Regions:
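Exposed aromatic-hydrophobic patches
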Residues: 108-113, 148-154, 224-226
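Exposed beta-strand face motif in extracellular beta-rich ectodomains
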Residues: 120, 157, 233-237
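C-terminal beta-strand-rich structural cap/linker in extracellular carbohydrate-active enzymes
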Residues: 148-170
Length: 258
């Protein structure tokens, strides 16, 4: 018979600061333990935290997550220390839920406890809720000072803070998606065409695109990428794509006017 899973509640669990631990046993004998952790955040009386630890049947920790909710996007060194102790590992993902006065979540920020504790330089991405893709938002670098991290975002969303090394890998892949839809087009004199970028490029990553022509007498291009053929000849139209992280890439399209 299949074990349907069990759960029980333990009162105070010391000395790691965990309280009201709920343990769920899965059919494969793995366990999921969720506990409250008492935290104090200056100027935020409603701040609260919990830790969820998943262990395999042998008792090895396979994942550890903590949720901190309150009115500020602040992680203090003391809170991070408490959460690491409660989880029993530095390999802990902390999800900060920033709420408004009504208690509704404005945005969330996910960050590795290890990266905060060791004051790593971090870059922010927003997670696309439909695709799960990481999208660029700005060129800023965030860094904890003495293990204290303070971040805030104006727009609603799910944000993630990654090390600059991890971010560089994602940014490199995004740069690769910048390409023209067509490398060459033939247009009759007096007619128009358009410089379109490849659909692989997620427009949410783009800050702006500017266009240039190598010979205005042969063809002109406007700010929206619309190309007008003026007289016979060959011309190169360039698109300079600036991403939200400030990085740029120039791609071109060959236009033959007949």
């Amino acid at each position: 018979s299949v074990n349907p899973g069990t759960s029980d509640t333990k009162p105070d669990v010391k000395p790691d600061g965990k309280q009201d631990a709920t343990i769920e046993t899965k059919p494969d004998e793995s366990t999921v333990e969720t506990s409250k952790v008492e935290i104090t955040v200056s100027g935020d009386k409603k701040a609260e935290a919990s830790v969820t630890i998943t262990k395999d049947a042998q008792g090895n920790v396979t994942s550890a997550n903590a949720t901190v909710s309150g009115s500020k996007g602040t992680l203090t060194a003391d809170v991070v220390k408490q959460l690491i102790e409660a989880a029993g590992t530095e390999d802990l993902t902390i999800i900060v839920q920033v709420k408004n006065a009504n208690g509704d979540v404005k945005y969330t920020v996910s960050v590795s406890a290890k990266n905060v504790k060791h004051n790593k330089s971090l870059k922010a991405f927003v997670v696309n809720r439909k695709t799960g893709e990481y999208e660029l938002i700005n060129s800023k670098t965030y860094k904890a000072e003495d293990g204290n991290l303070n971040v805030s975002f104006g727009k609603k969303g799910d944000y993630v803070l990654l090390t600059t090394k991890e971010a560089a890998r994602i940014e490199k892949e995004i740069l690769k998606t910048i390409a023209p839809k067509k490398a060459k087009a033939t247009v009759k004199k007096g007619k128009t065409t358009e410089f379109k970028l490849d659909s692989k490029l997620n427009q949410n990553n783009v800050k702006k695109v500017t266009y240039k022509t190598s010979k205005k007498s042969i063809a002109t291009v406007n700010k929206n990428g619309k190309i007008k053929a003026n007289r016979k000849g060959t011309v190169k139209i360039k698109a300079i794509v600036t991403l939200k992280n400030g990085k740029t890439k120039t791609v071109s399209m060959k236009i033959v006017v007949r």
